[in-house]
Amino acid sequence: MKKMMCIIFSLCFFMHLSTTYAESNTKLNYPSNRNKLFVSEDVFYEQLDKKIYKEYNNAAYSVRKKILFKEVPDEEFSFLQKTAVGCRSSVVFQDSFIHPDRQVYFFASFSQNEADEFRKYIVIDAETKKELREGKSYHHYDNPYEK
């Protein structure tokens, strides 16, 4: 029992230590910018190069939000859920640390017709305007009555 308590305490201590180190690290690629002011999501979208991201012309559902980085998984899940894709994916960013309180823009668009569904989303850093993540999916429905 004592060994188990020591192991649990040690794990908690090291997790807290690593979190503290990550928060105090001065070499963050994307530190917190929670208190900075940035343009609204609609203004940013209008100024955005449409080669980077453009909503579908006939979109059935679109999202434009300025959120904190820690809210990205929830927004991604909400978008996928509202567009009938019930799987939750993990958001993994490599080679850089992004502070949870970093402001980002989240844009998503969904379009469908009788045979096809298209989804796409993008996460863009509000300060540097660099793309942090994007995703696209396509699904084709076959007509079961055609031969």
Where are these regions (language model features)?
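Positively charged n-region of N-terminal signal peptides that target proteins for export
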Residues: M1-M4
